[in-house]
């Protein structure tokens, strides 16, 4: 089912509000051609062709016995595969399929590298799929991971049976995210000597609190504080992430659309998938649906886990 007016009307009622539906209806009517498809300019792929070194990603594989392509989970910026442990186990129980979770380059237990772009992260994912002899999969990516999933689908569509982009669209992300401030605050954290882990976390949180006001975000960032050789450090590559932050907020340009099923699953309380993004979603992913989960913000899978799992399972089983 494509992004048609009837689908969008059903989505808007009770979620983003009737005023958004009216706005989109007017926009669609003025932008669509006679056959109901949006008239959009095609881009180029010049930014996606440069070579880069592929990183051997760290992964966890949750075994399942049911047939069907495995589910591959991709985390967001400052996240790691451990964010999806409970989600992965639940998906194995509900679908019976294998579930693979990955640490992106410069995150978690994966190696660091000087390049942090979506084509590079796409190449990393393709390599691990090849290494594990996975010829087709269902990609599920949150935020940065969602843009990585889109890039893999657009570059290597035969590898992706379908995909889910969680609370992110193929549009440039407005830098209202606070990520530049988070990076700067993390870089300023200083922990002296060999101290207990509990003390290190407390001191780091105190230093972050002047910039990162939300306690939940501080706790999320602190999952990256690790001990190495008796001292504490950030396991994410802050320097490279900072250098490539604009690459991560942007999205590469593509000409050819992805022909398979896609789901853009947003939080109803989050601004990251809006009506302004629908034309580009329609252009690149003509078989996409857009759904919103009530009461969820950007971290949809954490805010409304039950609803998130139901949406994922319904989409996976809709083949």
From Swiss-Prot:
<dbReference type="InterPro" id="IPR029058">
    <property type="entry name" value="AB_hydrolase_fold"/>
</dbReference>
<dbReference type="InterPro" id="IPR000073">
    <property type="entry name" value="AB_hydrolase_1"/>
</dbReference>
<feature type="transit peptide" description="Mitochondrion">
    <location>
        <begin position="1"/>
        <end position="28"/>
    </location>
</feature>
<feature type="active site" description="Charge relay system">
    <location>
        <position position="239"/>
    </location>
</feature>
<dbReference type="GO" id="GO:0016298">
    <property type="term" value="F:lipase activity"/>
</dbReference>
<dbReference type="GO" id="GO:0045252">
    <property type="term" value="C:oxoglutarate dehydrogenase complex"/>
</dbReference>
<comment type="function">
    <text>Catalyzes the hydrolysis of diacylglycerol in vitro and may function as a key regulator in lipid metabolism, namely by regulating the intracellular levels of diacylglycerol. 1,2-diacyl-sn-glycerols are the preferred substrate over 1,3-diacyl-sn-glycerols. The enzyme hydrolyzes stearate in preference to palmitate from the sn-1 position of 1,2-diacyl-sn-glycerols.</text>
</comment>
<feature type="domain" description="AB hydrolase-1">
    <location>
        <begin position="69"/>
        <end position="304"/>
    </location>
</feature>
<protein>
    <recommendedName>
        <fullName>sn-1-specific diacylglycerol lipase ABHD11</fullName>
        <ecNumber>3.1.1.116</ecNumber>
    </recommendedName>
</protein>
<comment type="similarity">
    <text>Belongs to the AB hydrolase superfamily.</text>
</comment>
<dbReference type="GO" id="GO:0005759">
    <property type="term" value="C:mitochondrial matrix"/>
</dbReference>
<dbReference type="Pfam" id="PF00561">
    <property type="entry name" value="Abhydrolase_1"/>
</dbReference>
<keyword id="KW-0378">Hydrolase</keyword>
<dbReference type="GO" id="GO:0005739">
    <property type="term" value="C:mitochondrion"/>
</dbReference>
<keyword id="KW-0809">Transit peptide</keyword>
<keyword id="KW-0496">Mitochondrion</keyword>
<feature type="active site" description="Charge relay system">
    <location>
        <position position="143"/>
    </location>
</feature>
<feature type="active site" description="Charge relay system">
    <location>
        <position position="298"/>
    </location>
</feature>
């Amino acid at each position: 089912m494509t992004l048609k007016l009837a689908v969008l009307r059903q989505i808007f009622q009770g979620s983003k509000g009737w005023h958004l539906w009216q706005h989109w209806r007017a926009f669609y009517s003025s932008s669509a051609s006679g056959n109901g498809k949006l008239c959009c300019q095609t881009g180029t792929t010049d930014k996606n062709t440069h070579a880069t070194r592929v990183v051997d990603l760290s992964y966890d594989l949750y075994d399942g016995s049911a047939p069907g392509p495995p589910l591959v989970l991709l985390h967001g910026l400052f996240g790691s595969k451990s964010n999806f442990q409970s989600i992965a186990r639940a998906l194995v129980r509900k679908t019976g399929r294998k579930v693979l979770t990955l640490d992106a380059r410069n995150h978690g237990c994966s190696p660091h590298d000087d390049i942090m772009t979506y084509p590079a992260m796409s190449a990393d994912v393709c390599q691990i799929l090849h290494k594990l002899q996975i010829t087709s999969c269902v990609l599920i990516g949150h935020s940065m991971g969602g843009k990585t999933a889109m890039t893999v689908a657009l570059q290597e569509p035969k590898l992706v049976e379908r995909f889910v982009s969680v609370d992110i669209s193929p549009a440039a992300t407005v830098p209202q995210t606070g990520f530049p401030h988070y990076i700067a605050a993390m870089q300023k954290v200083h922990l002296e000597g060999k101290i207990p882990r509990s003390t290190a976390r407390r001191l780091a949180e105190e230093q972050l609190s002047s910039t990162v006001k939300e306690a939940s975000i501080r706790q999320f960032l602190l999952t990256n504080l690790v001990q190495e050789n008796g001292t504490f450090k950030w396991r994410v590559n802050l320097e490279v992430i900072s250098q490539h932050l604009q690459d991560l907020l942007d999205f590469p340009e593509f000409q050819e659309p992805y022909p398979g099923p896609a789901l853009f699953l947003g939080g109803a309380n989050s601004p990251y998938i809006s009506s302004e993004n629908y034309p580009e979603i329609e252009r690149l992913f003509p078989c996409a649906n857009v759904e919103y989960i009530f009461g969820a913000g950007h971290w949809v899978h954490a805010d409304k886990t039950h609803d998130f799992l139901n949406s994922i399972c319904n989409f996976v089983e809709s083949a």
